[in-house]
């Protein structure tokens, strides 16, 4: 990969990872337009640069990530309950993270097999887009007074499992999950960002473990400059994308993202019908 290709792909990652538009679908188009061959390193590159995107969330919301709950625990709470009350933010992240983590470990081979189908990505982009056209009306605007309980966190985690189908978009699934639990657009989007940190970090570390286990250490070390550039670009672009997204959805909702998904899915299907040999990076 050239530096130009590295930067473009990292920009695509940063722009699409936290927006409900499917980063996988955009990677397919970017790869084809750039003429990048889907080698083992290119596949590794596309998930390793997720570290940069993950870091953008931690930096933007560092106060939320490193602030404990110092309010008094409920009267009569035992030691465990007081502990969970203090670490309330991390506890609910863990509750939401577990469903996808368990399914990911149990069905990793089946998920990898689905990731080979570009048609599935295109179809799910369109189906998800149609749903997003109406999700604002279906779930209204939510309420800032809605208590964020462990049950609601777990339900969002179940929604995240749907995103294992390529083309759905992890961001879309978890945001819709949050809105279905009565959260506002902003609260649902922000928890989606927070949940991305353990989810994407865990998935990336697991994939890197598989690479190293299969003797891919040299593959990573020989391309360290490319990986560093990709992570830096993804970090910067993801920060800008998150700021834009939060501001936009508070004012206008998700309909524009629905139409956008339908267009992108349609483009991929047309390219397939025209005989393009599209591959997932």
Predicted regions and their residues:
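Multi-pass membrane proteins that catalyze or facilitate reactions on polyprenyl-/lipid-phosphate substrates
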Residues: 1-281
